[in-house]
Amino acid sequence: MADAAAEIGFNGVDLTVRPNGHVLPERVEMDLPKAMEAIKNAGLATTMITTTVQDANDAIDRNVVETAAELDVKYYRMNWLKYPDGKSIPEAMMQFKKTLTDLSHLNRKLNITGCYQNHSGNLAGASIWELWEILKSADHKNMGVQYDIRHAVVEGGLSWRNGLNLIHPHIKILAVKDFIWSNKNGNWVVENVPFGEGMVDFKSYFKMLKEFNIQVPVSLHYEYPLGGADRGASTITIDKQIVFDYMKRDLLKLQQLWQEA
């Protein structure tokens, strides 16, 4: 994996440390150092990891964060939070505030930064305004946002710029991908597409990032059909070179649009 990422042109790998990921949470102390060593040997960095961490008092979650910090990982993406049945949204948001605040205090002790991804749908933080609210009491140096423009446009439509204006001081990592609305059997659904071929106005978005002077790590996501690679499958149904070609194509397109913005 590391050698392929280097050959494609990436300068780092966003490792998944979660069930069915590159590293299993319960094996983080044994396997994360090995994975990071392989990445380092390929000339790449491990600046960030993607996790299911969500509770500062959970032993496995704490161990993931502590191990990552010891290995000098700078950022981790935490798990998404779900609105519980039987509670009003304001009540649930009070609990979410405490969750992020507690994690931010753990992060501060360990000198690592946690990030919450805005994800479209019914998860907490789908709306940028929601996310801004639940971050209010956290230590903002050590807890922020993995801002995902694809999900922001799905939820924000034409008002995504307002959300970015609001949340940009809290952005720690960027996640980028693209989509279209597609009619499937009479129902309109979100369909992931190759970078730059969808509804995200990347030139306007990148221009705003430059205006805000946002210089943070970027994770390029591949979620359109790639023979199972898009879903993290251990075996895929298309030749791996086809996957690598799409990955390089998207990376070059990202770099091109950034330069043009």
Question: Where do the protein language model's features map onto the residues?
Answer:
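Residues that line or immediately flank small-molecule/substrate-binding pockets and catalytic motifs
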Residues: 17, 53, 80-83, 171, ...
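Active-site acidic/histidine proton-transfer and metal-coordination neighborhood
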Residues: 2-3, 19, 38, 53-145, ...
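Residue-level marker for beta-strand->alpha-helix junctions and adjacent short loops that shape enzyme
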Residues: 18-20, 56, 83, 121, ...
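Glycine-rich, proline-tolerant flexible connector loops at the mouths of alpha/beta enzymes
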Residues: 14-37, 87
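Histidine-acidic metal/acid-base catalytic patches
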Residues: 1-11, 128-143, 147, 153-261
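Structural preference for beta-strand elements that scaffold enzyme active sites
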Residues: 12-14, 45-50, 74-77, 111-115, ...
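Short, structured active-site "lid" loops
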Residues: 38-45
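A short acidic, helix-capping loop that chelates divalent metal ions and anchors anionic groups
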Residues: 19-24, 84-89, 155, 184, ...
